[in-house]
Every structure is written in structure tokens, then in C-alpha cells.
A protein has these predicted regions:
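C-terminal substrate-binding subdomain of Rossmann-fold SDR/epimerase-dehydratase oxidoreductases
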Residues: 1-122
Length: 122
């Protein structure tokens, strides 16, 4: 299975950039043919993802390396609703605010591991 992991700083950057460029209302909005991007209360939805899916076992390996610990792995069959792979399409975000998350998984996990070590769970 593959998943698309995104570092938190990239998510924050994407959200902040969107706050700086909100959708604007359209005086010609037609409620019979609604377009949420130009409604009286306009909004836009964006995927904020890294767009680089990684095998879950590779993710676990990188996390183990970053934390200096081996995970206890328990393999389960796919659950109803699971998909084999996911990846974010950030093209709309890039077009709207000129931003694409870019923190490599390895770096994000190293930073996460440092944070976990600084703020351990009880």
C-alpha cells in the first residue's frame, strides 16, 4: 500500500497562502447554476499534499531510522474502504497561490523524530 505523507510545515504554508488570497464573491452569482468559487459566500477546496506516494513499509523503515527504534509490526488485511494507493493532486493549489508542498519525506520524519524526542509522550 502507498500513501502520500505531507510535512506539517508544508500544510501550514499552504493554508497561510490561501488565507492571503481568499475567493471573492461574484455579483452575477446564479443560485440555479451554483459555482462555489464565486458564490455569495465563496470558498475553494484544495489538496495540500506532497504528491509523492511511498510504500507504507518504506515509511515505517524511515520512521524507525529517524527514531532509532524498531517498530512492532502487525500486518492486517486491507479494511473495507481502503485503497491501494493515494496521492494528492495539488495542481489547483499551485495555480491559485503558487505553492506546492516540497519537504522530502526523510527530512520531515527527521524533524518529526526530533520533536517527539523534545516532547515525549508520558
Amino acid at each position: 500500500m502507498c500513501r502520500d505523507f505531507t510535512y506539517i510545515d508544508d500544510i501550514v504554508e499552504g493554508v497561510v497562502r490561501c488565507l492571503d488570497k481568499p475567493a471573492t464573491p461574484d455579483a452575477a452569482f446564479d443560485p440555479l447554476a451554483p459555482n462555489p468559487a464565486t458564490a455569495a459566500a465563496p470558498h475553494r477546496l484544495f489538496n495540500i499534499g506532497n504528491s509523492q506516494p511511498v510504500e507504507l513499509l518504506r515509511f515505517i523503515e524511515l520512521l524507525e531510522n529517524a527514531l532509532g527504534r524498531e517498530a512492532i509490526k502487525r500486518f492486517e488485511p486491507m479494511q473495507p474502504g481502503d485503497v491501494v494507493a493515494t496521492a494528492a493532486d495539488t495542481s489547483a493549489l499551485e495555480a491559485w497561490v503558487g505553492f506546492r508542498p516540497c519537504t522530502p519525506l526523510e527530512l520531515g520524519l527527521e524533524r518529526f523524530a526530533a520533536w517527539v524526542k523534545d516532547y515525549p509522550f508520558p
